[in-house]
Amino acid sequence: MFSIIVPSYNRKEEIPALLESLTKQTTYNFDVVIVDDCSKEPVEVTQSYPFAVKVIRNETNQGAAESRNIGARNADNEWLLFLDDDDRFANDKCQKLADVIAEHTDVNFVYHPAKCEMVNEGFSYVTNPIEPQEISVERILLANKIGGMPMIGVKKDLFLKIGGLSTALRSLEDYDFLLKLVQDPTFKAYKVAEPLTYCTFHTKRSSVSTDTTNTQKAIDYIREHYVKTAEQEKNFAINAEYMLAYPHIMNLSRKAAFYYFEIFKLTKSIKQLVIAFVVLISPKLAINLKRLDRKSVV
């Protein structure tokens, strides 16, 4: 049924806990494909599990996007799921998705909310994806209203048909993938209402760089390939500022306020102006405002 693709780079210590978490699935209708992206210490799986585990090691570092592509190409099952080594699936995720797919046989893409935990701040919120009938390039250019790779399932043949994740990008690869995906004429989506993936986020994490060079390159690439109309440009200009603000706000940097001021100038939204001032005063306070709205947009 499913092949779960797990890219890993220099985090082999996370793999045993991830695999152990998957033993709690209510059905074992899946296998796991771990793609070790040329880690300094190779990923090794010596324990046996109630599902098949395949480890593929890249001879050179390829990046997360190509590692997922390699996993997809080597997947044995019809459907692909994606899991990062520090995220977790709900215990009934594979069963619920299988039930949906059995009932809706014309579907080739499934997605669902995620429960996101802000570890340092001590609270969580649930994302709020749009409905399938609302999905369009215009809506996604305004914001990724579907979710990241751990929140989706896609048929392998469709994934490969559209070329998988772009290896030309080192940022926003999942966003670019969704823009490609929704333009395919065979695209047929189904939304599951429950959050079926648990994601953790750490502010001030050393792995989150405030260097937005790759993000800006990805924004330029997406603008060139997908923005065709004045309305699309208007939408994407706003989202671009959000995406540039993200690494700064996650590093609790007041520089994020600059991007929120830019959003205010584009939207004339008082809410964005207030956010900009709050970020300028205290980025940590701005993040904690999510406590007031536990049901959040993606």
Model-derived segments and their meaning:
Residues 2-14, 18, 25, 35:
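A conserved hydrophobic helix/loop-capping motif in glycosyltransferases and polysaccharide synthases
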Residues 10, 22, 37-39, 62, ...:
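Conserved short acidic donor-positioning loop in nucleotide-sugar-dependent glycosyltransferases
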Residues 19-57:
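Acidic donor-binding segment of Leloir-type glycosyltransferases
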Residues 58-75:
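Glycine-rich, basic loop-to-helix element that forms the pyrophosphate-binding segment
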Residues 66, 94-158:
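Flexible acidic/His/Gly-enriched loops in nucleotide-sugar-dependent glycosyltransferase catalytic domains
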Residues 80:
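Short aromatic/hydrophobic "clamp" motif used to bind/position activated sugar donors
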Residues 132-216:
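Conserved nucleotide-sugar donor-binding catalytic segment
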Residues 194-203, 207-235, 254-266:
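Catalytic core of nucleotide-sugar-dependent glycosyltransferases
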